[in-house]
Amino acid sequence: MNIEFSNIEARVIGCLMEKELTTPDLYPLTLNSLTNACNQKSNRDPVMLLSEAEVLDAVDALIEKRLINDESGFHGRVTKYRHRFCNTEFGNFQFTGQEKGIICCMLLRGAQTPGELRTRSHRLCQFIDVKEVENVLDKLVQDSLVVKLPREAGKRDSRYMHQFSGEVDLAEVPLTVAPVSEVVQGDDRIEQLEKDLSALKNEVSELRYLIEQRL
């Protein structure tokens, strides 16, 4: 795979993919809207505080790589940007809706478990259950687009990470052994409440974004 995003480039592509799916009436995005999306506090890990200049530098680099289109010529005075990373006529990748949702979520939040991906991608795509997420992840792993990370000490599930920022060297993934007293058994009820809270926060953030763009 010839693609290797910087952290900011991954965030930019992830944001364009997300807004394409969640707010299609506001897509493609202006530089200001894209910067706001990159700096969102919800559904982002890590939270960034990028300037428009930093975002524009990443956009210019992605235009050079032919992964973003500058659509200023078609939308009047304001320059707007559209990704061509996947599912375009000349794109290298053609993903299913579920694959696209998972990749987008990983570009925005990094390594995650199948359960986290199911919860956090609910506005991007739909999964019946975690098993369906795992099946899609297995396909992406087979295509060398995603890698399964070693399970962390005290954790029930392994995380998965995209490889669009370079191949993940599993030998360099830190493994820590937690003391027995610190190993907490997963509580399904608490875990579900946490997932529901995360989903609500994402919806509030999207509503706030929509309101800001319409003012």
From Swiss-Prot:
Record InterPro entries: DUF480, WH-like_DNA-bd_sf, WH_DNA-bd_sf
Upper lineage: Bacteria, Pseudomonadati, Pseudomonadota, Gammaproteobacteria, Alteromonadales
Pfam families per UniProt: DUF480 (PF04337)
Record family assignment: Belongs to the UPF0502 family.
Name the UniProt record assigns to this protein: UPF0502 protein Ping_1905
